[in-house]
Regions:
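Surface-exposed strand-loop-strand hairpins of Gram-negative outer-membrane beta-barrel proteins
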Residues: 27-30, 58-81, 116-124, 165
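Residues that define the transmembrane beta-barrel architecture of outer-membrane proteins
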Residues: 47, 76-84, 122-132, 169-175, ...
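Long, hydrophobic/aromatic-enriched structural stretches that serve as scaffold segments
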Residues: 77-141
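Transmembrane beta-barrel strands of outer-membrane/channel proteins
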Residues: 51-59, 101-107, 149-155, 195-199, ...
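Outer membrane beta-barrel transmembrane domains
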Residues: 70, 207-313
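Short loop/turn motifs that connect adjacent beta-strands in outer-membrane beta-barrel proteins
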Residues: 26-28, 40-48, 91-100, 140-147, ...
Length: 313
């Protein structure tokens, strides 16, 4: 048995706050898309203006039930999301750290197929997703560590239709608290271990008495910087590593319009490789990572690819 709303699966939306962005599914509540961060997930650059472009590629044909079993849904879903994030790390200090703010504007394409025969659902759409606004975040830097926290809101301005699974809007507000850190085991900072967690709460779904349960999710990464002289043409400062994420629904869905089992909580884990490098003359960082999901319950299980490009000004 799965949540009824998962028949209208994979409403993809992309957000981003503090090292982020999101793709989500039907009544799976999270706005944030896992997989947008990896190596040095909780490390923020110094004061300045930055443009961060996230490209997400999610592919799945596997819907998992409440016990992790594959549900015969004849599912085939592909999502491409492009999230545009503008970041200002100010010179203003709060609690000894740098105050920063950012906004994330996602656009999402979803190609959705599920079911059989007369019950088969086909839908595809490209549209604006819900917008992430983070007015308050703080980052700190020590000799062998970085840390960051942040508060963000997700505004339901994206196209929303509960009867169309390819629509990117989710139809409700969300609030996200983010906190994490990066530790450098060696003085030269060639090794890094990072963790970035988020707690997400949701408002009522538009025109329905439904409030989805809170979510907790985190991204992590273990990275190794290669020798500086190791480069390919203009590409320098290579780092390689292993990354991953996990997501858990914390409490029950609620409301008189909930028609599925409120006690069912979705979850998923993922792990995969990452490589990143810098193009110094362009002041640009490029990150490529792939996360392979496993042990999913009450949601899809697939592959999340990500290409992120950050430009400093």
């Amino acid at each position: 048995m799965i949540k009824k709303g998962l028949r209208v699966l994979l409403t993809a939306l992309f957000c981003s706050l503090l090292w982020v962005i999101p793709v989500t599914a039907g009544p799976t509540g999270n706005h944030y898309t896992n997989g947008g961060e990896g190596i040095k997930a909780a490390s923020v650059p110094g004061p300045g203006f930055y443009y961060r472009l996230y490209n997400f590629f999610y592919d799945t044909d596997d819907l998992k039930g409440v016990n992790g079993e594959s549900v015969p849904a004849n599912l085939d879903v592909f999502v491409y999301a492009q999230a545009h994030r503008l970041i200002w790390v100010t010179p203003i200090k709060i609690l000894g750290g740098d105050w920063l703010m950012d906004v994330v504007v996602p656009v999402v394409y979803t190609d959705f197929e599920a079911g059989n025969g007369s019950t088969r659902v086909l839908d595809d759409h490209f549209a604006l997703g819900d917008v992430f606004i983070e007015p308050l975040a703080i980052s700190w830097h020590g000799d062998r560590w970085d840390a960051a926290i942040g508060l963000m809101a997700v505004a339901p301005v994206g196209e929303y239709d509960p009867n169309r699974p390819a629509m990117p809007g989710k139809g409700y507000w969300s609030g996200i608290f983010t906190a994490g850190g990066t530790f450098f085991p060696d003085k030269a900072k060639t090794w890094s271990i990072s963790y970035l967690g988020r707690y997400e709460i949701h408002g009522n779904v538009r025109n329905r008495d439904v409030q989805l349960g809170d979510d907790y999710h985190f991204e992590w990464g273990i990275g190794k910087a290669l020798p500086p002289e190791k480069g390919i043409g203009p590409l320098r400062a290579f780092e390689v590593g292993v990354v991953g994420y996990a997501q858990f629904q914390i409490n029950d869905d609620s409301g008189d319009d909930v028609t599925w089992d409120k006690n069912v909580h979705d979850r998923v884990y993922a792990v995969g490789p990452e490589v990143r490098f810098v193009i110094p003359q362009w002041k640009t960082l490029v990150e490529l990572r792939t996360n392979f999901e496993f042990e999913a319950k009450d949601r899809t299980e697939g592959i999340m690819g990500n290409l992120t490009i950050t430009k400093a000004f």
